[in-house]
Amino acid sequence: PVCLAPAAARAAFEKGAVDAWIIWDPFLASAQKMLGARILADATGVVNNRAYYFSSRDFASRHPEVLRIAVEEINAIDRWAAKNKDAAATELSAVLGLDTAITRLYLGRAQFGTAPVTREILAEQQAIADAFFDLKLIPKKLNLLHAAPVGL
């Protein structure tokens, strides 16, 4: 495997310098719409597709109420986006500089909602980190408990 940033990987894929590309949305949706790329396999049943919001441990310890409010607001936006996908696609296309057809495809398969990290989620991520280390994709073994939220 060759590890490239999304823009470099797309260029390599587009030129035929790589035969396949592992990527996530909205880059996947863009490749599908603009390059005619097709999905050979996805991670359904292997790993969960999650996104994360981070803060420093110090900030989280000093301002838990701010983080609670942030999660509430993110969930409010997610609820709106889930019910208004066309409007959300238009908004997102302006922010990302992508055609609305791309953001519409991306949002059509997106999962909405934010929740605190749990021990189960951390265990999923630890298994992925361990596999990456075993495959020599990362240089050292990680202990994700070091990144666990305060109080977990």
Predicted segments, located by residue:
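Secondary-structure end/capping motifs
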Residues: 61-139
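Short beta-strand-to-loop elements that line the ligand-binding cleft
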Residues: 1-5
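Pocket-lining segment of extracytoplasmic ligand-binding domains
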Residues: 6-94
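Residue-level "edge-of-site" marker
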Residues: 26, 45, 106, 145-146
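C-terminal solvent-exposed extensions
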Residues: 134-152
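Short secondary-structure boundary/hinge segments and terminal tails
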Residues: 31, 48-50, 110-111, 148-151
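Residue-level detector of family-conserved "landmark" positions at structurally sensitive sites
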Residues: 42, 103, 142-143
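Residue-level signal for threonine
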Residues: 56, 118, 148-152
